[in-house]
């Protein structure tokens, strides 16, 4: 009798080194066979700033598509690639206040700037998910959530900055962590704000024939 095949053995490549996205996929029983760190230029292009609300959507879409294309190229270049024809999943999350896309905070100064802009305001989080099937078919979805921060005092901001939780996070905060104490309202997908909208991701995978969901 063959041993039970674990639900985690999935022919899927995650084009992201984000532990948050890997953890979210695991939540719905999907653990990638391979993860790839896809380093691409995340600088907004001139054509991505035409209309209010369009900036972060276009930026998120371009970056997610770029990550997917990079993953394809890397897999083709690796002669010893462990998977001949996997599904590829790429995603990119952009946090924006109005037309202004916030950075992935890497310094305390960037984190402080983000928190100052977010404090007492509503902002939007866009994640584009791109899935490529083994036969080359593509599907994508852009998901939007709205988040409202309570007004943070200077002392609260400094305490959060001291935690270091913001480092590498889009918009300089993690809703699944200490920042939850300052989230007054959320409209839309919670997992989208963490980094991967699970319902929409599962729909994309199912639609392209991913059999583990």
From Swiss-Prot:
InterPro entries: ITPase-like_fam, Maf-like
Active site (UniProt): 92
Keywords: Cytoplasm, Hydrolase, Nucleotide metabolism
Cellular component, GO, one term: cytoplasm
Presence of the UniProt keyword Nucleus in the record: no
Domain of life per record: Bacteria
Enzyme Commission number(s) from the entry: 3.6.1.9
Location in the cell: Cytoplasm
Class of this enzyme: hydrolase
Hydrolase recorded as keyword: yes
Catalytic reaction annotation: dTTP + H2O = dTMP + diphosphate + H(+); UTP + H2O = UMP + diphosphate + H(+)
Annotated site residues (Important for substrate specificity) in this chain: 20, 93, 176
Principal cellular location given in the protein's record: cytoplasm
Gene Ontology biological-process annotations: nucleotide metabolic process
UniProt GO molecular function: dTTP diphosphatase activity; UTP diphosphatase activity
Cofactor(s) this protein requires: a divalent metal cation
Protein family according to the UniProt entry: Belongs to the Maf family. YhdE subfamily.
PANTHER family assigned to the protein according to its UniProt record, in alphabetical order: BIFUNCTIONAL DTTP/UTP PYROPHOSPHATASE/METHYLTRANSFERASE PROTEIN-RELATED (PTHR43213), BIFUNCTIONAL DTTP_UTP PYROPHOSPHATASE_METHYLTRANSFERASE PROTEIN-RELATED (PTHR43213:SF5)
Name of the protein: dTTP/UTP pyrophosphatase
